[in-house]
Amino acid sequence: MPHASQAAPRLFVRPALPDDLPAMSAIYAAARRLMRSRGNVHQWVNGYPSDELLLTDIRAQRSFVCTTEDGQIAGAFCLLCGIEPTYQRLYDGEWPNDLPYVTIHRLASDGRVGGIFRACLSFARSKSAVVRADTHKDNLKMQQLLVQNGFQRCGIIYLEDQSQRIAYQLG
């Protein structure tokens, strides 16, 4: 059964299905264009996230879509339950606690509907009291959303390719 967001009652979160891939790919393409228009030219390059990665996430049951009341997909994200390997080493800061957490990755919207972040966060909080996320230093919109929704900037992490991200935690 889809999870209805309390913050955005007209949005629902459900597990992504392989048939959702075309809509998800279009959402990520729109998000990349929006990032570029806002000066964020270094994040999500070379077609990231790829359809292959999205299918891997779908099969692992960690990919979700935000839908409108009529079932239209308006956003997508990955929710990792358990330890995020790149969060094992945090630089220039510390995590507020060592409690179990979920991690929001690859949150994207096509821009048609507001409240995607709130729907995603509501869903994540239904899985864990502690939520972590990270973003690129040039992704000012995501940084703003995180802070506005109570996330604390905790430090810097490095991805497998050694690119730097700002790490946040709520709870």
Predicted regions and their residues:
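Conserved acyl-donor/pantetheine-binding loop and adjacent beta-alpha core of acyl/acetyltransferases
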Residues: 78-112
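Conserved acetyl-CoA-binding loop-helix of GNAT-fold acetyltransferases
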Residues: 112-126, 144-148
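Conserved GNAT-fold acetyl-CoA-binding loop/helix
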Residues: 32-52
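A short beta-loop-alpha structural element at the N-terminal edge
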Residues: 11-26
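C-terminal "cap" of GNAT-fold acetyltransferases
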Residues: 159-171
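Conserved beta-strand in the GNAT
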Residues: 65, 72-83
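Conserved active-site alpha-helix within GNAT-family acetyltransferase domains
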Residues: 138-155, 160
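Conserved GNAT acetyl-CoA-binding A-motif
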Residues: 126-138
